[in-house]
């Protein structure tokens, strides 16, 4: 049983959904970034979704673009990111760790090389934001060869065919979008999700975690009630880093409080 399967089985026993925060590694700097990841897990995060800083994050709204800029300004490289993941992995052997990256980053030193690094660091899954299922073959094959789950996005506008492909090709979990567009807490999550979930279940998709625009406990509760296996919160988590970056102590406390309130909302 891999880490995601073990997590979902465990949560099912407790009658809970998963709460998964997203942060960009190296935001606001590599040292504090490690403390942030540690704080998120200690405060109740069931898994982590991590970004490797990239200079042109297309699918991200201004909040996460800001995180990328801060991380790059603090000289965070992919090598530093993998070091930090390795460190977190050795402290938390069972917590699933997913990466959310862009194709250029995977291509940079060769696809196999990228997935080898993921495997060595203890990464469980990789979602490549700008690679749709029909262009995913070489990434997917390399991921699977290295024991990494390829994650695919199920958008709200998806046709039954797309959902079936996402269900068939994905592993670990399915990233279910609560709305189309760029990420951000500003636009409230619109939730036509029950229908999408029903479809994905028909096609035997990996458990669906709802992302995009999830910024408060009520939305987590709603996602879990609708039948999602959990919720991912990116912009709202990153916004706290942006607000408190000058005061590490206040920053870690704000993240811990936010995480524990979001996690509490996953109880069915």
From Swiss-Prot:
Gene3D superfamilies, alphabetized: Aldolase class I
InterPro entries hit by this protein: Aldolase_TIM (IPR013785), RibuloseP-bd_barrel (IPR011060), Trp_synthase_alpha_AS (IPR018204), Trp_synthase_suA (IPR002028)
Gene Ontology CC terms: cytosol
Enzyme Commission number, as recorded: 4.2.1.20
Pathway: Amino-acid biosynthesis; L-tryptophan biosynthesis; L-tryptophan from chorismate: step 5/5
Catalytic residues (positions): 49, 60
Annotated PROSITE patterns: TRP_SYNTHASE_ALPHA
Reactions it catalyzes: (1S,2R)-1-C-(indol-3-yl)glycerol 3-phosphate + L-serine = D-glyceraldehyde 3-phosphate + L-tryptophan + H2O
Recorded GO MF terms: tryptophan synthase activity
Keywords: Amino-acid biosynthesis, Aromatic amino acid biosynthesis, Lyase, Tryptophan biosynthesis
Listed SUPFAM superfamilies: Ribulose-phoshate binding barrel
Biological function: The alpha subunit is responsible for the aldol cleavage of indoleglycerol phosphate to indole and glyceraldehyde 3-phosphate.
Self-association and partners: Tetramer of two alpha and two beta chains.
HAMAP family linked to this entry: Trp_synth_alpha
Similarity annotation: Belongs to the TrpA family.
Protein known as: Tryptophan synthase alpha chain
Origin species: Aliivibrio fischeri (strain ATCC 700601 / ES114) (Vibrio fischeri)
